[in-house]
């Protein structure tokens, strides 16, 4: 038998108050922990992902105060693509991608080409008469809707509505209807007002819709237009003049893809104008380029070489990324055109790494051929996942920007309110596990409560998240612009070196 002296004094009867206090601490702790685990396990996958994004979204220490955005603005006429194309009385035996549409038959062929792939695209209609016929047929549709359109106007509208502390100045051709549709706090210039709005016809279709012998594998849209002003020299000059006058701490340039349909001489002159003015913007002011649908290889090569290196940030989707890789001898050239579904993540990672390393800023400043290069951030978005890529130290808070963009993607498609969460309308479409980066053998294991993954490859940071996809989307147009604008405003930019004054 042990004597009482062997019993530690802490367990003696004299310390009963200590025992009770420890007990009163442990019991609530374990009860709270059990309840938290039980509550988390009771969430649906969709709700768990949404709450995880909410936790990741933190506003940057210094928000952008002033933004100048240009230069394409129009009114989107959104219609049922299948209904309108069927009503055109044209025939189409096979889909074929036309760089420029001259007739309604060309429209039918090109629409069918992308429809059977479920891929978004945009093409210019060279004949004003044919375009007016399409507009008349579209406006006669019982389900036509008018919305603000154009990448610049959509991004300005999104920032004004969701980031009231940021003053937004939009430069673009603004007609009477777009003037009424724009958010009232968006500042605009009278010098680019037009009497009649530019119209873009948005031919939307839903997954499972039938056009002739083809079935749409996913919901998407086809855009066509006959713009007069968005790519005009006057609008572009006013855009860069506004930058000098307004002195913003953020510049967003969009609509460059609309120059593709102009004469070679005209677009070369405008490309020189853009590059010359980009070089005059101080390095402390970030420039974001939102890319649009491209088809002409010569023009797109000019964009890659003459504009892309001289912006700080790029917004891009899978069609645009694979096309750039295809024409510039990048990795996985065979992925263009994108077929039904999305490109494997590890292939997109390879293309993004190539794009940033080839056309991005040299943090060391030792590569002479990259003098003046600024690109250090890419925000990639497709239907099922988003990736943020960055090099150097200029950009931070990137996971918050990625999560904020991912959070709104499916919600906008389904038209779900900001303060509601209807998980039945959304679904996850990525596998439970897959390869993120083959080169460094980085794998992804899906966890609904922690969907965001990040890793370094050489000096490049990657941040990845799957996205909740709308099962029955009510709209597809404008989602990319909203994602990019939201991700950009949650990102923080600060360049330490090369101080410059306006």
From Swiss-Prot:
CDD domains: ADPGK_ADPPFK
GO molecular function annotation: ADP-specific glucokinase activity; metal ion binding
SUPFAM superfamilies per UniProt: Ribokinase-like
Classification via Pfam families: ADP_PFK_GK (PF04587)
Active site per database record: 481
Residues bearing carbohydrate: 89, 190
Locations listed in the record: Secreted
Catalytic reaction list: D-glucose + ADP = D-glucose 6-phosphate + AMP + H(+)
All copies of domain ADPK, residue ranges: 44-497
Enzyme Commission no: 2.7.1.147
Cofactor binding summary note: Binds 1 Mg(2+) ion per subunit.
Co-factor(s): Mg(2+)
GO cellular component annotations of the record: endoplasmic reticulum; extracellular region
Alphabetical list of InterPro entries matching this protein: ADP_PFK/GK, Ribokinase-like
A single BP term in Gene Ontology: glycolytic process
Signal sequence coordinates: 1-32
Positions annotated to bind Mg(2+): 290, 320, 481
Quaternary structure and interacting proteins, as annotated: Monomer.
Function in brief: Catalyzes the phosphorylation of D-glucose to D-glucose 6-phosphate using ADP as the phosphate donor. GDP and CDP can replace ADP, but with reduced efficiency.
Descriptive protein name: Probable ADP-dependent glucokinase
């Amino acid at each position: 038998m042990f004597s009482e002296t062997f019993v530690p004094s802490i367990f003696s009867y004299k310390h009963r108050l200590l025992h009770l206090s420890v007990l009163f601490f442990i019991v609530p702790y374990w009860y709270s922990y059990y309840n938290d685990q039980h509550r988390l396990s009771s969430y649906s996958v969709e709700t768990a992902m949404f709450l995880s994004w909410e936790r990741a979204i933190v506003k940057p220490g210094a928000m952008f105060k002033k933004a100048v955005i240009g230069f394409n603005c129009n009114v989107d006429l959104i219609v049922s693509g299948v209904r309108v194309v069927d009503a055109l009385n044209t025939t189409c035996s096979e889909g074929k991608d036309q760089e420029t549409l001259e007739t309604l038959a060309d429209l039918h062929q090109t629409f069918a080409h992308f429809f059977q792939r479920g891929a978004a695209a945009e093409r210019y209609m060279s004949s004003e008469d044919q375009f007016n016929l399409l507009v008349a047929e579209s406006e006669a549709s019982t389900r036509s809707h008018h919305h603000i359109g154009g990448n610049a106007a959509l991004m300005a509208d999104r920032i004004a509505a969701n980031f009231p502390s940021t003053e937004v100045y939009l430069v673009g051709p603004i007609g009477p209807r777009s003037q009424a549709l724009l958010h009232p706090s968006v500042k605009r210039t009278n010098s680019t007002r037009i009497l009649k709005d530019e119209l873009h016809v948005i031919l939307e279709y839903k997954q499972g819709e039938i056009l002739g012998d083809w079935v749409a594998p996913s919901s998407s849209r086809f855009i066509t237009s006959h713009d007069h002003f968005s790519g005009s020299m006057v609008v572009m000059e006013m855009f860069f003049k506004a930058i000098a006058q307004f002195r913003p701490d953020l510049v967003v340039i969009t609509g460059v893809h609309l120059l593709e349909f102009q004469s070679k001489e005209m677009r070369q002159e405008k490309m020189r104008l853009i590059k010359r003015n980009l070089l005059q913007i101080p390095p402390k002011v970030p420039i974001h380029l939102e890319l649009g649908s491209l088809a002409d290889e010569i023009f797109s090569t000019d964009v890659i070489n003459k504009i892309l290196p001289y912006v700080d940030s790029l917004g891009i989707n899978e069609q645009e990324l694979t096309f750039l890789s295809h024409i510039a001898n990048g990795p996985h050239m065979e992925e263009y055109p994108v077929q039904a579904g999305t490109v494997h993540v590890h292939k997109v990672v390879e293309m993004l790494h190539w794009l940033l390393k080839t056309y991005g800023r040299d943090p060391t400043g030792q590569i002479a051929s990259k003098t003046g290069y600024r690109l250090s951030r890419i925000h990639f978005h497709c239907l099922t996942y988003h990736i943020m890529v960055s090099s150097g130290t200029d950009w931070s808070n990137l996971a918050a920007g990625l999560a904020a963009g991912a959070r709104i993607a499916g919600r906008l498609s389904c038209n779900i309110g900001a303060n509601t969460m209807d998980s039945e309308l959304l679904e996850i479409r990525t596998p439970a596990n897959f390869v993120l980066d083959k080169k460094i053998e980085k794998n992804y294991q899906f966890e609904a409560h922690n969907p965001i993954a990040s890793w370094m490859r050489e000096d490049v940071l990657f941040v990845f998240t799957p996205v909740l996809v709308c099962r029955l989307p009510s709209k597809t147009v404008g989602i990319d612009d909203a994602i990019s604008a939201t991700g950009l405003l949650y990102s923080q930019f600060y360049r330490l070196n090369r101080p410059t004054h306006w």
